[in-house]
């Protein structure tokens, strides 16, 4: 299984319940498409280097994932691009 790390930035003015629902939804997108979520945690609220959609801060969330193929990652990528609550995301393959 290949290991991946996903980092995404959530808009800072989101309510706690909505943030938890968003994280649960995107974790389930990964697991429903065959990936295993090893760890999913909110990192912290950080100042951005530049404005993204009129925001100067963002909530960073990091997810460690194991997957046999990239179907789950492609679906995560597709849905996170159209979600207004996710400002940016990045998927990185970890070399073991």
Swiss-Prot record:
Q: Which domain of life is it from?
A: Bacteria
Q: Which is a GO BP term held by this UniProt record?
A: translation
Which ranges form a coiled coil?
none
Q: Which UniProt keywords apply?
A: Ribonucleoprotein, Ribosomal protein, RNA-binding, rRNA-binding
Q: Name one GO molecular function term.
A: structural constituent of ribosome
According to the record, the segments passing through the membrane are none
* Gene Ontology CC entries for this record: cytoplasm; ribonucleoprotein complex; ribosome
Q: Does Transmembrane helix show up as a keyword for this record?
A: no
The UniProt similarity line reads: Belongs to the bacterial ribosomal protein bS6 family.
NCBIfam families per record: S6
The record's function comment reads:
Binds together with bS18 to 16S ribosomal RNA.
Q: What is this protein called?
A: Small ribosomal subunit protein bS6
* Gene responsible for this protein: rpsF
């Amino acid at each position: 299984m290949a290991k991946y790390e996903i980092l995404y930035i959530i808009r800072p003015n989101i309510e706690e319940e909505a943030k938890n629902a968003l994280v649960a939804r995107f974790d389930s997108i990964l697991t429903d498409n065959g990936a295993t979520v090893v760890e999913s945690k909110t990192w912290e609220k950080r100042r951005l280097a530049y404005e993204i959609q009129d925001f100067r801060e963002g909530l960073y969330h990091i997810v460690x994932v194991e997957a046999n193929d990239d179907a789950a990652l492609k679906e995560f990528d597709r849905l996170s691009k159209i979600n207004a609550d996710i400002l940016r995301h990045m998927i990185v393959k970890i070399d073991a």
